[in-house]
Amino acid sequence: MDFKRFFKIGVLTLFGGIFMANSFCSAHSIRTPEGNMPMVHWAVVESTPGGMTAMGRIARETVGPQSAREAGTYALYGGIDAQNPDVMRLLEIYESYEAYRIHSTSEAFQAYRAARLPVLKNLRILEANGIALEQKDKGVGKVVYMHRYEVIPEKLAKYQKLTTQEARRAVNEDDGVLGMFVTAEHDAPNVIHTMEIYRDREAFEKYQASEACQTYMMEVMPMFSMTHMVENMPGNIVLSDKGIHNK
């Protein structure tokens, strides 16, 4: 399985946190009020050389406060690539397309978009569908990993079932596993993009060494025709509790 707070409430605070975490937390699936999977996409942002820090400051000063107030902007979680600090991958979760429209057309977002132009080299949006969006209701994660998997099409249904089960189990049972997010490309449903959020390095290593994780990986590894892992720079992801309706 596998993807800093850019503009919103529950995102990574490479650029500064907005919400305080509580040590007492429980696990939940992010859903709409009707119980449906929310709208999901990935934004891959590339800055000019050395420009990511400036882009973060711009986001924090423009669109960040607005995003925190938007009820339909559930989460903006991401990380900066440890191998290329000019690249950030951001998982965006919205209640609906209308919620995304409200976010992306707001005056604050337009101000952010205009101000970042001098340091923005490239932006790519990848439409996706959620498979598992599991997280604790509170917490601050310092370690983020992302993966891209290509699943053998005939194995996709079984992969989705096993992965959903393990994502829920890990977030529920493992104290240091704060979030497990699994998505499929909209136009290529066997291409999987994941994000894992851990409290710290120790929590990551403990999960990787656990019997449950080892068993899960033994089951799903034969289902992949390609795997790619992204390790992200250390940061602070402050979890959002938007999209959690059974608190």
Each PLM stretch: what is its role?
Residues 53, 95-106, 157, 199-210:
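Short amphipathic alpha-helices within nucleic acid-binding modules
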Residues 37-46:
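Acidic/histidine-rich, surface-exposed loop or edge segments in extracytoplasmic proteins
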Residues 45-50, 94-95, 150-154, 198-199:
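Structural beta->alpha junctions
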Residues 1-11:
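Bacterial N-terminal signal peptides that target proteins for export
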Residues 51-73, 108-112, 155-178, 212-216, ...:
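Short amphipathic alpha-helical segments
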Residues 27-37, 74-86, 111-150, 178-191, ...:
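Glycine-rich beta-strand-turn "strand-cap" elements at beta-sheet edges
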Residues 140-200, 206-207:
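Conserved small-residue-rich
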